[in-house]
């Protein structure tokens, strides 16, 4: 019997001879999984009862500690159906807005404060934490506005910065807290519209090719 190492040259030769067929087979499998995941999300949000397109809906793990993998990552499209169903069984299906609320409340309930995130032994750690908190407060204040698309008001943690022209994007605004000053943050924010998570998700979906990602 051939061992795995002996099999490798055969596998390489087979793929080289059938490359286009294999690529098409993978694409068909990915498309089928994408349709499957979207169909499961064609239902009202469990929290707000709102009805939204499937790309606005999320699988939210009830217990994050039981999460084996994200159901929104592109590589999930090649997971076996049994593995997907096992992971989906751990989740509630909620809209992106309600998912943002759940995530924020989980952080609060688990006392995941700035001190918890900003661990360190630097002699300047308290100074750094104050700097980061000032940036956190700045981003919260900037989001104290209605969603530009829906006109509705939401808690600041449901609102997001959406770059009007993705080619002009230098940074993800929410990730600038620890490494940028107020002027740099405000310069990046000036390129953005402030929209709720649901509207941001819808904008992003409409910009992408049909084959891009799970959304």
Residue ranges and their predicted role:
Residues 29-37, 78-86, 131-140, 179-187:
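Short, intrinsically disordered, charge-biased short linear motifs at domain edges
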Residues 91-111, 192-211:
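Short Cys/His-centered divalent metal-binding micro-motifs
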Residues 68-98, 170-199:
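Short beta-strand-alpha-helix junction that forms the catalytic/metal-binding core
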